[in-house]
Design a protein with these regions (language model features):
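Active-site nucleophile-adjacent alpha helix/oxyanion-hole segment immediately C-terminal to the catalytic cysteine
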Residues: 22-256, 360-362
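Hydrophobic alpha-helical segments
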Residues: 16-17, 59, 272, 383
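Bacterial Sec-dependent N-terminal signal peptides
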Residues: 1-22
């Protein structure tokens, strides 16, 4: 995969909403669970981190009503993840990929093994270089090239100093990760912050997906490049995965949502109903792409004139599988699903929080049709207590 307290946001989202006079969809909120403020990953492939932390912020607020606002530090997680990924890349002689992207599991792994910290205990994104948002244009390519040179070296023995060099590059950009910090008058380590303040248990979180090339109700390593830690997902039939998503939100939960956003129906800047994702029942000529950097222009969604909540395809398990098998469904982007709304025709949509800043007519929030979610969801990470009991029993969780 290449984030106002919700009480304020919900007051806006709960009203029927029309982006502007040319748009045809009007949304009314059915339920909007608490989320934190919209963030901006800017020019970086860190959606996996922003979306996972957005999800964990909601989790912490749900578990601890005294927490009224929360902003977890992306730089801490990315710092820890990139050095681990560099190590894996070198150990596999470059066969395990190294890129800006990542998976939800990277954040769960970081929480379990290194902890988490609140924003403000490391330099804010890119402030060390005179900016206020991530911009990996100058930072990442030299580091990537250095790691590749080590991993693909024909030397019989490599100098272990390479790892200190890479950690230095990472620290120079993000700042060093603190061993202790003060928050709301108390001293924490990253690990005690998770346990004592956030009160989150990494073992509560599971990844769910739906594909037929592995048995249902088993777990498997989802075969995507950014799953470099080889995290496992539980495999459900499509109707049960959709039931988990729907019932979780209606019962007060949110979840991290990984999906393909390269579809023409994922409407961005132009045309009707921008920031709405649908599966229009028409032939698509969308190009392949991923994440914000390729979608801030007018190409994506420009040809859509039927994203009006009607005429969507009926999604089957076979369609999902075909998209995955032939690469038309790709691991593009991580987001957070937090609510359900309906349009003026009574059709339901998931409400999604993005990490592209206050972008579009809904200021960083999107509406995702259920057919789109059924078709293009790669996986979700969710609190296992949000999964219906009968499905948990089938999965053994």
């Amino acid at each position: 995969m290449k984030k106002l307290m919700m009480m304020a946001v919900a007051a806006v989202c709960a009203l029927p909403t029309m982006a502007e006079s040319g748009d045809s969809l009007v949304f009314e909120t059915i339920i909007a669970n608490p989320v934190t403020s919209i963030k901006n990953q800017n020019n970086s492939g860190t959606c996996w981190c922003y979306s996972s932390l957005a999800f964990l912020e909601s989790e912490a607020m749900k578990k601890n009503p005294k927490i009224k606002d929360l902003d977890l530090c992306e730089s801490f997680v990315v710092n820890k993840t990139y050095i681990d990924r560099a190590d894996r890349n070198v150990r596999t002689h470059g066969d395990a990929s190294f890129s800006q992207g990542g998976s939800f599991y990277d954040v769960i792994y970081c929480m379990a093994n290194y902890g988490l910290i609140p924003e403000g205990n490391m330099p804010y994104p890119n402030t060390l270089y005179g900016d206020s948002l991530f911009n990996f244009t100058s930072f990442f390519p030299p580091m990537e090239a250095y790691i590749k040179a080590i991993a693909k070296s024909d030397a019989k023995k490599i100098n272990p100093m390479w790892k200190k060099d890479v950690q230095g590059m990472i620290d120079n950009y993000f700042g060093k990760c603190p061993e202790t910090f003060k928050y709301e008058g108390k001293i924490y380590t990253p690990q005690t912050f998770v346990k004592d303040y956030l009160k989150l248990d990494p073992n509560d979180y599971v990844s769910l997906t739906s594909y037929t090339h592995h048995p249902f109700y088993s777990s498997f390593i989802l075969e995507i490049q950014d799953n470099w830690r080889w995290g496992s997902s539980y495999n459900l039939p499509l109707d049960e995965l959709m039931r988990v998503m729907d019932e979780a939100v209606k019962n007060g939960w949110t979840f991290a949502w990984g999906a393909d956003v390269s579809e023409e129906g994922f409407s961005r800047r132009t045309g009707k109903n921008r920031c709405v994702a649908t599966v229009p029942d028409t032939k698509s000529n969308a190009g392949v792409g991923s994440d914000q950097s390729k979608w801030t222009g007018e190409k994506a969604g420009a040809k859509i004139s039927v994203a009006d909540g009607a005429g969507e395809k009926t999604i089957t398990q076979e369609m999902r599988q075909l998209g995955y098998d032939n690469w038309t469904t790709t691991d593009d982007h991580g987001m957070q699903i937090y609510g359900i709304a309906k349009d003026q025709n009574g059709k339901e949509y998931f409400m999604m929080k993005n990490s592209w800043g206050e972008y579009g007519p809904y200021k960083g929030f999107w509406y995702v049709s259920k057919p789109y979610a059924a078709y293009k969801t790669m996986n979700i990470v969710i609190n296992k207590n949000a999964v219906p009991k009968d499905i948990r029993k089938k999965l053994g969780i």
